[in-house]
Amino acid sequence: ITSARLMIENEKNPTTLRIDDELRKIDTYVEQVLYYARSTDVEKDFKVEKTTLQSLVHAALKTYSKPLIQAGGKPVLNDLDIPIVADSKSCTFVIGQIISNAIKYRKDNLQIEFSTKTDKNNISLFISDNGIGISAADLPRVFDKGFTGENGRRYSKSTGIGLYLSQKLCKKMNIVLSVSSDPGQGTTVTMVFPTESYLKEAGL
């Protein structure tokens, strides 16, 4: 893969750009496989530290910058400079999976918006897109292992692993992950982080 990337950098043309797209997909699948292999005890690799939602979102957007640009994506970031305590690597992976799905299941002129809400014990991150949405029949199963649903079968090759792994990681980090959707209108994924003070009070 490294050799192929060097070749692409040295000779950019429509063919090598298509190869670059496929290499990015391979990178994504490899990352999913590695997380899946460690999913039973992934918390051993956690490094819980102070960060901000803005840092996590920027890191995930950087990873998916090229496919976002190719999809005409326009990320909108609203009031994300909010401190949280979390494992940055795992949270960036989860946000990246959500961005990846927004790209896969987009309509023309992809829009993806990041917004927040805070209360006494929780900080919520909302990630909303204007894509094709998820059917009411599929929505309860989006976190099932291997579930691809109608969208996965019709529009895009899908492993059905990304959201499954994201849910497992979030549970281990005491983050509540949920999905709501209006078919044909878009999808909103919500990550609810416990505040640092709440974690201390709960002894977590």
Predicted regions and their residues:
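Acidic ATP/Mg2+-coordinating residue in the GHKL
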Residues: 129
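Glycine-rich ATP-lid/hinge loop adjacent to the conserved G-boxes
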Residues: 147-157
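Short conserved segment of the HATPase_c
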Residues: 134-147
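Conserved micro-motifs of the catalytic ATP-binding
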Residues: 41-46, 83-87
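Short helix-loop "hinge" at the ATP-lid/N-box region of the Bergerat-fold HATPase_c
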Residues: 102-103
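Short conserved segments within the C-terminal catalytic ATPase subdomain
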Residues: 67-76
